[in-house]
Design a protein with these regions (language model features):
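N-terminal low-complexity or amphipathic/hydrophobic leaders
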Residues: 38-48
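Glyoxalase I/VOC metalloenzyme domain signal
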Residues: 1-5, 10-30, 47-188, 192-285
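Short, solvent-exposed beta-strand-to-loop segments that form ligand-recognition rims
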Residues: 34
Length: 285
């Protein structure tokens, strides 16, 4: 099973406010419509590689969202991550055979503002309530019904998404992901500015992060205590972080293993959404 990121949901209590903030930093989303159950709606920032950020919120403050209610209520940002697969049912069977619990398949849908109906199958991996492992998705309708490149990023320097997943035990989590997805041995480093020890899997859009115990990781410990093991950040890949800085509102980059990361210049998005260079050589600024 390969790790091809389909999308990362970003939980916000107010979709209009989230859209305004993303637009301010240069990532203007497009409204995507309401999910079939009517309790959530979303906006999309779609990249050229087909991946996208999904800003998701409840449709009515008096009705609990069916998806990620605790994350949405608290404006928690990244709340899950999704990978594309050819066949959800077949993928879930392989995961069961590997000894991991699953839920699904389920069929979901969303109606776009123009009336187009997108439909897809999804399946969840791992224990109920945990977003440590990705959920899986396969389209029933043409993928373009669900997402296409968004004007604010199409043809630009941002080329895709990498997920940073907060975990409690880095060693055990590395082994679990390597066993399930056949990943290479990760590179590891402590990143003081992020307050975490990070493992990055070469060639795959995944990093695992566990809090440093020197006080700098307090924010990440609190996030784990509140939401459990789940994504804590999204990094948007770029070949040229300097060009990305010219087009989007970014803070000064910092070292990130053998790469560099620049967080978006937003208190709401700090340490939750950034840009990552593909290599040190491409990261000059």
């Amino acid at each position: 099973m390969t790790l091809t990121i389909d999308h990362v949901p970003i939980a916000r209590s107010d979709l209009d406010a989230a859209t305004e903030e993303f637009t301010r930093v240069g990532l203007e989303p497009e409204y995507g419509g309401t999910h079939a159950d009517g309790t959530t709606h979303m906006a999309v920032v779609g990249f050229d590689d087909g991946s996208y950020l999904e800003l998701i919120s409840g449709t009515d403050p008096d009705i609990e969202p069916d998806l990620w209610p605790a994350f949405i209520d608290a404006d928690a940002g990244p709340c899950a991550w999704c990978i594309s697969v050819e066949d959800v049912a077949a993928t879930l069977q392989r995961v069961i055979d590997a000894g991991v619990r699953v839920d699904g398949p389920q069929t979901m849908a969303r109606e776009r503002p123009d009336g187009t109906r997108a439909e897809w199958d999804i399946g969840f991996l791992g224990e109920p309530g945990s977003e440590k492992f990705p959920f899986t998705i396969a389209d029933r309708a043409p993928r373009s019904y669900r997402v296409s490149p968004t004007e604010s990023v199409a043809g630009g320097p941002l080329t895709g998404i990498e997920a940073v997943v907060a975990v409690r035990n880095l060693d055990a989590s590395v082994e679990a992901f390597r066993r399930l997805f056949r990943l290479a041995t990760p590179a590891r480093a402590e990143i003081p500015e992020f307050g975490a020890a990070v493992a990055s899997f070469p060639g795959d859009p995944l990093m695992l992060a566990t809090p440093l115990d020197d006080g700098r990781g307090t924010w990440l410990t609190e996030r784990l205590d509140t939401y459990g093991e789940s994504p804590c950040a999204c990094l948007l890949s770029t070949e040229d972080i300097q060009t990305a800085d010219e087009e989007y509102a970014l803070r000064e980059p910092t070292e990130w293993l053998d790469r560099r990361v620049a967080w978006f210049d937003s208190d709401e998005l700090d340490r939750a959404l950034g840009v990552v260079s593909r290599s040190t050589a491409a990261a000059g600024r």
